[in-house]
Amino acid sequence: MSARDLVEGEAMLDDEENEEELADDYDGEGEAHQGAGTANPYDSSEEDDDDDDDEEAARAVREGFIVDEDEELEDRAERRREKRKRRREEREREDEHLDEEDLELIGELNPSLQAPVAAESKFKRLKRGHKDRDLRQPSQGIDDIFNSDEEEEAAGDYGRHGHRRHMHDEMDDFIEEDVFSDEELQREREDLEIARPAKKGMTGLGATDAAGLDENALEDMRAAFGDGNEYLFALEMEDQEEEQEEDEEKHLDLKDVFEPSQLAEKMLTEEDNQIRLLDEPERHQIARKPYRNVVLTEEQFREEAAWISNLMLLKKRIEPELREPFQRSVAKVLEFLVTDDWEVPFIFQHRKDYMIHAVKAPVEGAGEDGDASQYTVRAEKLLNMTDLWDIFDHDLKFKALVEKRNTIQKTYDNLQSLFNVSDSVVEEMLPAAVTMEELQDVQDYIHFQYASQLRDMTLMNSDVNGETHRRKASSKTFFERVRNGKAYGLVRAFGITADAFAQNALKEGRRQYTEDPAERPEEMADGFVDNDFSNASHVIKAAKSLFAEEIVMSPKMRKVIRQAYYMNGAVDCFRTEKGLRRIDEQHPYYEFKYLRNQQLSDIARRPELYLRMLKAEEEGLVEVKVRFENFDQFRQRLYPDIESDNYSEIADGWNRSRRDVLDMALGKLERLINRSVKENIRQECENHVAKECRETFSQRLDQAPYKPKGMVLGTVPRVLALSTGSGVVGREPIHWAYIEEDGRVLENGKFVDLSIGDRDRNIPDGKDVEAFVELVDRRRPDVIGVSGMSPETRRLYKLLAEVVDKKDLRGAPYTDDHDEEISDRLEVIIVNDEVARLYQHSERAKKDHPSFAPLTHYCVALAKYLQSPLKEYASLGRDIVSIQFKPGQQLVTQELLLKQLETALVDMVNLVGVDINEAVTDSSTANLLPYVCGLGPRKAAHLLKIVNMNGGVVNNRVELLGVNAQYPAMGVKVWNNCASFLYIDFENVDPDADPLDNTRVHPEDYDIARKMAADALELDEEDIKAETDENGTGAIVRKLFREEAQDRVNDLILEEYAEQLEKNLNQRKRATLETIRAELQQPYEELRKQYVFLSTDDIFTMLTGETSDTLAEGMVVPISIKRVSDDHIDGKLDCGIDALVPESELTDRYDIPVRALYSPHQTVSAKILFLNRKNFTCNVSLREEQVSRPVSNTQDRLRGEWDERQEQQDRESLQEKTQSGGRTMRVIKHPLFRPFNSTQAEEFLGSQSRGDVVIRPSSKGHDHLAVTWKVADGIFQHIDVLELDKENEFSVGRTLKVGGRYTYSDLDDLIFNHVKAMAKKVDEMMLHEKYQDGTKDATYSWLETYTKANPKRSAYAFCIDPKHAGYFFLCFKAGENARLHSWPVKVIPQGYELQRNPYPDMRALCNGFKLLFTNMQAGKRR
């Protein structure tokens, strides 16, 4: 079967798509098709060997494809029950082989055996146990392994007719949804009763009968031989040992029950436990995992500090006099990170002084003996929080650098010790290499220069290690043959080495001069002829090639080219043939379709543009080329560095040869460096975009909760949130939820009509206005939040604002500056809903409030966003990458983006701090713990677990170390990192409470804080001692708070404190003292900015999904007509914006009535003339003259940056093709019709739901239509519809045919019974338990993991085929050692198609697959 046969009729694919044919056959398909049609009678006459093979094959798949993902314990119990059942049936079959005469004969020969036959049979079965229960079981045919209840139900439709077998074989425990009858369950219970071990002595009942003796004779026997229980103790010990072994078998680890991927997802692996318990910050452990074995020497540590400083100075503008302090600051931060294991937030908060350069300057006019007050301190901040994260990343990169350098050094050391190699190039360039590229250059040089020695060294190592492998015949490379032959003399005759030439090109050190030989190259070559190179021309060619390769492999020369490339690099973009047609002027890629001569500095200013270019290149629409500008000039500048200065014919001859060599080398070097430059630019652009996303995210995090009127910043408001979602106000219900300041949802419900009436016109208020007013008066919210998913939200906002205004609804009263109680009118605000959209359908929402509707969940999230944006963002976890922060964000790898966004969360969480006791009881606060300094998801969960074990309350910070607590929650190092960021509410009544535990002051600075408090209270040492003896160590600070004397700390002169600390303790604490002073006055003051209200543009983008780039004046867009009047037309854009067509812009044809041209529900193209982003309205034109001239989206460009000539040629070429077609644009009156091509249809459906449809013109002519529908995200199917029985050229045919198989009466019939039917089947497939989200490779990986964890089982799963819309892969693996296979599953309106067999639903498809596979295996056996 060919792959092309998988697509039923080419008409299914629209030729506008330029669809590729199914390039690769699905593996296993041909075999399956052949096997499916093969009869399979069981042949009992096969030889024993064949039977064994069949038994092996059966066992490989019998654990197979019908298994549900049950737990391992249930599987084991089920297998035991089924094997017992099989043994019983085996004995019954054996009994059937004996006829009545045989049984009678046995009874006559031994009458005593007639009665106990059944009992002995049972005894033997129990004694045999589970070890040999399968030994004598005949092989069941592999064609029977898939028999199941499901197959019996559906076999009449697509299976073998009337061929049912009553079998209980090993496959029975894999039947989906097994149901056991009451009789079977009763038999299972009886089996379990019988299986109980009995005493092994002869003292039980029936012993007399069994021996055939009377009681007296039995007594005599007992007297002589004992009662049979003398050794019972040994048998009992044996029983106990067996029971103990069974108990040990029953003891299961998590890894025995769950798959490795599940354990990793839940962070329950051994590695996770190690991270959890190791006393080192979690983020440090994870980041440094690859470099655990890299230990830096002191010299390397100093080198690293300089390396990082130089990297950062390239991007920072720092005054020359600050460069040295900057380098010292970087070195100190590196010491804190690496040696002390302090995380970035700790360093930034508690080691600020090392990031500030302070200089004392005397006040003008002050005398030389002036005191300290006559000096001013000028402080320069050298490093910010982002710089600290950069240093952390650079540290990891340097460790990778050192690891690679050590590997290369070890290789070179071995070469030295074994072959006495000494190479100045390696010894000079290896220590000097500062990038991975430069190290790779050295490595390439070694492998080129010493290839044969390295081969010998590998063989020697393998001999030492005892490895035996076949030695390959020694085959020297071309360059080795030259180097080891005579021809190498000609290479040396060039008069300069590759390294010396590279040194000249680098302009480093003393110039190296070139020496000319006494003979011409051709003459000298004659003397080097040998067996390898038979004439002079061959010798010259070989010598030039080797010398050119030596230049290419020279690390110095590569450095020259690389530096020059970055200085002179330019980027060009060329459209491909595919891009010529696909990228029209409305396409987002048109911005760079003809872009040329982009300097690397231009790329740096717009990194997302370069990433989009590379994305378009991946899609085959453009080709991105990075080139070396003015490369010929660069080449000319290098010639003198390799040529000799002599003037003679001989010198000219040699210089020509040298230039030839250089040309060869530069050609190779240009190609080599080009690849790395292109990739490096991509990495830099990705890093830049990710950091831009981090900056934007930081701004969104840096906002306090909405501040109620009259309250201090940081107060959590009570919120009433309302939304209609994407519904129409007045038509769909308005969902609402009221949330208290503690985050509890106290009430929720729905309103329908909140419109305000008009007394003058006797129009009453809406029926829900009174209920709304009553709710507000009863709950007294601080703010009303509104949001939604369409411009209708603006109407809801205005409606609520009007109700608040007319009914004079006010918030909670508060006391103003004049001690008067006042209340302000409630504020209605539009809330950012980016978190709420993700929350409403999430599993977390269903868990938090199972009974709420999705839109109520949405309202809850809106309210909580107003209460704490930080908590809501933190609750998203990895889903945070779903939020759009910057253009081009989706072009950055998720891991890189997530890492950057996580650092922003870490920064803000540690700025705000976490109430540890609140985190124990409140899940939203607990979501912040993983971002606390020193912690992570594993350590945070462990911390909560230990706190709960210790009673559920933390009384002071030192309790976390286990002081006065049963269990320690963390080690000292982690505690030092996180202590100041976990605060404990201070209560005066608790004598053990330390007020400083409620501040940002670190425990290491508590003594300084207490000294400052004592000095502020003017207490002497005796007063301090008396106070602390009576009330504990926190007494002084408690007294400061109790007497409300915090303002006195402002009188302290902190400069003197700082000088004393630095002088006596060598600690720089000036900035820390400022922090302590601030905390003593207002503990954990809210440092975030005020809540940020959305701007007009933000609201417009949130409610429409459009930005200034995607929707602007001058663009041509489709509009749906709502009403047609003689003087205007009302319409709507796809994004929900109201469109008005004024009379002057209706048409160019005034001879035809407007109503004859346009009708309601018709979709037409229109040009935007005016866009009102605040009111969500626009004026548009339908005139052909306007629509045909959209505003070009190309920017003003410098000369030479845009290829106008190519653009004009392409435009003319496309116009010729359009004119040769001679067709006018077709318009159909249907709400789903759009005047799109295939690309536009895909872009339009990209943001729509699965199963949404666009009807559009077809390029095949007026008797065809194209229907595009969304199969899944990024996957669209284009269906070609053939129209028959048409009234005229522009009408829709009365009969519509799809693929030559399906016929429909009209478009609605086709949409409902064809497209929507297939969409339902796609949904059914993707909701099935066997469906795997992800790629085919990911599904294969899952199958590999599953079968490794369950070696005797087989498994199968479905996944989507992204290359062929409407198809899925059925991937399967028949056991651990079997090959992976996949079969194509086609979605059809009536169900699914597998191997040309139709199946109505997923149940039938699964059973059909099992039958097909069984038949295929049977066919193989035959």
Swiss-Prot record:
Gene3D superfamilies: Nucleic acid-binding proteins, RuvA domain 2-like, SH2 domain, Spt6, Death-like domain, Spt6, helix-hairpin-helix domain, Tex N-terminal region-like, YqgF/RNase H-like domain. Residues 1231-1331 form the SH2 domain. GO terms for molecular function: DNA binding; histone binding; nucleosome binding; transcription antitermination factor activity, DNA binding. Keywords: Chromosome, Nucleus, SH2 domain, Transcription. The keyword ATP-binding does not apply. Residues 11-29, 44-56, 66-75, 146-155 have a biased composition (Acidic residues). Residues 1-164, 1185-1221 are annotated as: Disordered. InterPro entries: HHH_9, NA-bd_OB-fold, RNaseH-like_sf, RuvA_2-like, S1_domain, SH2_dom_sf, Spt6-like_S1, Spt6_acidic_N_dom. Residues 1196-1215 have a biased composition (Basic and acidic residues). It is found in: Nucleus; Chromosome. One of its GO terms (biological process) is G1/S transition of mitotic cell cycle. Its main location: nucleus. Residues 1114-1183 form the S1 motif domain. One of its GO terms (cellular component) is transcription elongation factor complex. The keyword Transcription applies. PANTHER family: TRANSCRIPTION ELONGATION FACTOR SPT6 (PTHR10145:SF6). Belongs to the SPT6 family. Histone H3-H4 chaperone that plays a role in maintenance of chromatin structure during RNA polymerase II transcription elongation thereby repressing transcription initiation from cryptic promoters. Mediates the reassembly of nucleosomes onto the promoters of at least a selected set of genes during repression; the nucleosome reassembly is essential for transcriptional repression. Essential for viability. This is Transcription elongation factor spt6. The gene is spt6.
